[in-house]
Amino acid sequence: MSAMKRLFQLMADKKASDIFLSVGAPINIKINGVAMPINQQMMDGNTVRGLLYEVIDQKQRKEYEDTLELNTAFTLQGVGSFRISAFRQKGSPAVVVRYIPNIIPPLDSLGLPPVLKDIILEKRGLILMVGATGSGKSTTLAAMLDYRNEQRTGHIFTLEEPVEFIFQNKKSIVNQREVGTDTLDMRVGLKNALRQAPDCILIGEIRDKENMTSAIQYAQSGHLCLATLHANNSYHAMNRIISFYPLESRTALLQDLSATLKCVISQRLVKNVRGLRSAAVEVMLNSRYIAELIEKGEIGEMKEAMEKALTPGSQTFEQSLFKMIRDGIITQDEGLANADSANNLLWLINNTAAGADFAAGKERNPQAKPAAGVGSSAPFSEFKLDSSETERA
């Protein structure tokens, strides 16, 4: 097995999220949000380039050499898929690889709000999944889609760049198109998506006005449309969407969003008491009041509306983190460090019955001890690069 494939296997064995290949540094691997070197071998440009070239073809090599950028994916049979981003830095090659496991986790196994099951079974509307890079957006969306796949007949259609999780046909037929492999570009794929009779559409990441407009149009035409967006929370997501459009188009945009948006799900991963990571989730359901705020452009009022919402399933990050603290999943310090408003979280801890019990040291569940051999401190068997392997690539 080549050196790069052995690295991929190591990522799977250690449940790592990323590896980093950079000149002048050893290979670094990230586990549970903590990056560490796997050995003390400093890499040079030939080594980094050789590792990359082991897993890309001649066409991809030419693209990288011509454009100095490459985004692609590699599947290792029985192990999983790996999202590869190659670039140049300080005149030298560099690579970041994200691990996408073979198995889509069951929705119930992720500790997510139960309302997500109801949301993914909706007939129409726009669902936005937002969060920072590495926050688990893709995993949560894949688990939600696979739950629909198990529960509903129909056609699930994805347009991704690249395809990440691989779905099996269950009750639904699932067709997955990859930009660059199955369609020439995102624009062409988006234009033709409605002609392929989908019931549920995943269009990957929204990066610009064109993608956003397509997502809204799909929802308006009676489809359930899912997409991801880089934003910290619902408020930032709405502001980012608005920023895609010129001032003269925003009134129409806000009217369309207020009518089509089903919910915004925001996620961030926080360190739990076992040394692993758990998802804190904000859910903004588009209630009648939220829809009115969106239509009026009063985005700054949404946070308070969510805090006071009587809509079952809606919750802010502070409410999600409070539940995790109360249930002994995370420490109070970890919760405060990840809250949008530490003051609001402290208020919940000190001014609710469950919070008062926690503050008095009466946690519902005692903190679990870290699992032995699990997490970022798990030992590595020594990984050495044979220079002859990379030189042959």
Show the residue positions of the predicted features.
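Short, flexible helix-loop junctions that flank or precede catalytic/ligand sites
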Residues: 1-393
